[in-house]
Amino acid sequence: AEAQKIIESGQRNKLLIVLPDELKQKDSPWIEPANQLAERGIHIQWSAVDQFFYNILRKPDQLDLVVTVSPYGRIFSKMISSLEGGLGAGFETHRSKNNQIMFQIMHPASSRFVGKDAADPIGAILSIAAFLESQNKPLISAAIRNVIEDAISAAWVTRDLGGSMGTIEIGDFICSKLSGKSTIA
């Protein structure tokens, strides 16, 4: 459902569904939604877990939007955040069968950065934007995403992504840009 919303918003046009070997494509609850998206021109791919791990390491630029089952999603998220080098630059979405949603920041575990103004707050802020989107607040969500894109374009990123900012500086930059857009409801 979350992937379908992202695709329908026009942000993505390619979806990869990763399933363990014991959950064959024919048993997936995603078959019907995937077929509906394919009918609308969205490129749908299916992958086994081992093939997905290979693609993460060999062809990461070919991956766009990925959905899978627990616990694989958590494993993939941690692995990808470690590969990208970000200390909190991304987030993951978990949705239960009864439609409860949880957004969680992706980052490798690293106690050596505690108290050093080194974590990247972008994933946390993007997860807030996703939460607001899920609560039918698309204008606020879009404003947050736009400010983050502006920050990245202006090279206002944390040291883990090659910038010179700390956690507090990038957070303050994003908040100051958002406060200038306070008329958005």
Regions found by a protein language model. Name each.
Residues 1-48:
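Glycine-rich phosphate/diphosphate-binding loop of Rossmann-like nucleotide-binding domains
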Residues 1-15, 23, 138, 143, ...:
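Glycine-rich phosphate/pyrophosphate-binding loop and the adjoining helix
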Residues 3, 34, 124-132, 174:
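Buried hydrophobic packing segments
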Residues 23, 50-53, 72-74:
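Short, catalytically relevant binding-site loops at active-site mouths
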Residues 23-24, 42, 46, 65, ...:
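Hydrophobic alpha-helical scaffolding
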Residues 28, 46-50, 122, 138, ...:
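Conserved structured core elements
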Residues 43-62:
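A structured beta-alpha segment of the ubiquitous adenosine-cofactor-binding alpha/beta core
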Residues 57-154:
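Glycine-rich phosphate/nucleotide-binding loop
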